[in-house]
C-alpha cells in the first residue's frame, strides 16, 4: 500500500443522513469524472457529505480550508531550500491529482480569484495541472475528482466565483434539514434523547427565521450538535443553548434577548 494514499483515507464510515438524491447524484458525477460544487449555508453538512462520499467511493480525501492569504503555490506546490539544495514539494491539489484522491476546496470564495484559476485545466476535458515553476504538466489520475464548496449567503461583488469557474462544475444545493430529520441527525450524532433534540432544533429554527432581520446567518446544525454535547456533559439546557447556539451568531443585545426568551419558552 502506498502510505501517501493511506494517510488520506477515511477509516470509518462517517454518519451522514441524505436529505435528497445528493448521494446518487455525486456517485454519477464521480463515475463521469465531473467536478462538483456544493452550495449551502455554514454548518449544514457539506463537509460531512464530502467525507461520506470519499468513504463510500473508497477514495482518499485531501481537504483544503481556503482563505484570502492562500496563493497558487499553496495549492500546487513550491520549491524548498534545505541543506541538500532545492527540492520540489507538491501542494495538496497536485498530490490529489497524482494519487487519485478527492480534493475538497472548502469555502473556495475565500481564496483570491487569481489563485482559484489554477483549477481550470483540471475541471475540463484536459484534466491536467500545469506546474509552471517546475516545467511539468501533471495528468490527473483517472480516479481524481475536484469538489469545491461555498456559502451563497456570503457572496458579494468582492467575493464570488467567476462565471468561467462556476460553469465548470456540476452543482448541488444544500440547506439545513427538515426539523424531524435534523432532530434525528442531532440525536444520532450525539446520543441526546429525541425530545431534547427536537427542542434544540426548534430553537435553531427560531434563529434561522431572523436571518435578514438582524442576523446574517442562522444557527447551524453544527451548533445544535454542540449544544447537545454540552447538555450531555451536565450543562443545563438553557445555558448550553445560550453558549452554543446564541452567543456565537450575534453580539446584538436585542437579538440575544429575543433568542434568550425563545430558549426560556422552549425549555420551560
Which residues make up each language-model segment?
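Conserved AAA+ ATPase small/helical "lid" subdomain
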Residues: 183, 190-248
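AAA+ P-loop NTPase catalytic core and its hallmark functional loops
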Residues: 1-198, 202, 261-268
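C-terminal engagement/docking regions of AAA+ P-loop ATPases
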Residues: 54, 237-268
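Alpha-helix initiation and N-capping motif
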Residues: 69, 179, 234-238, 256
Amino acid at each position: 500500500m502506498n502510505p501517501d494514499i493511506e494517510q488520506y483515507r477515511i477509516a470509518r464510515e462517517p454518519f451522514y443522513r441524505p436529505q435528497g438524491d445528493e448521494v446518487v447524484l455525486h456517485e454519477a458525477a464521480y463515475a463521469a469524472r465531473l467536478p462538483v460544487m456544493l452550495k449551502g449555508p455554514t454548518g449544514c453538512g457539506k463537509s460531512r457529505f464530502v467525507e461520506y462520499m470519499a468513504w463510500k467511493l473508497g477514495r482518499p480525501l485531501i481537504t483544503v480550508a481556503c482563505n484570502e492569504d492562500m496563493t497558487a503555490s499553496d495549492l500546487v506546490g513550491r520549491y524548498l531550500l534545505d541543506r541538500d539544495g532545492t527540492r520540489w514539494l507538491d501542494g495538496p491539489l497536485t498530490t490529489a491529482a497524482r494519487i487519485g484522491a478527492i480534493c475538497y476546496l472548502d469555502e473556495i470564495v475565500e481564496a483570491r480569484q487569481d489563485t482559484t484559476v489554477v483549477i481550470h485545466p483540471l475541471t475540463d476535458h484536459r484534466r491536467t495541472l500545469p506546474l509552471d515553476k517546475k516545467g511539468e504538466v501533471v495528468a490527473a489520475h483517472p480516479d481524481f475528482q475536484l469538489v469545491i464548496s461555498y456559502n451563497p449567503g456570503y457572496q458579494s461583488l468582492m467575493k464570488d466565483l467567476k462565471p468561467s469557474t462556476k460553469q465548470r462544475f456540476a452543482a448541488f444545493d444544500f440547506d439545513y434539514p427538515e426539523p424531524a430529520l435534523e432532530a434525528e441527525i442531532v440525536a444520532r450524532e450525539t446520543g441526546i434523547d429525541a425530545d431534547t433534540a427536537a427542542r434544540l432544533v426548534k430553537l435553531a429554527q427560531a434563529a434561522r427565521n431572523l436571518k435578514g432581520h438582524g442576523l446574517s446567518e442562522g444557527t447551524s446544525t453544527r451548533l445544535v450538535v454542540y449544544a447537545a454535547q454540552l447538555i450531555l456533559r451536565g450543562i443545563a439546557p438553557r445555558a448550553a443553548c445560550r453558549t452554543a447556539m446564541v452567543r456565537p451568531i450575534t453580539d446584538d443585545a436585542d437579538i440575544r434577548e429575543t433568542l434568550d426568551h425563545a430558549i426560556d419558552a422552549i425549555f420551560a
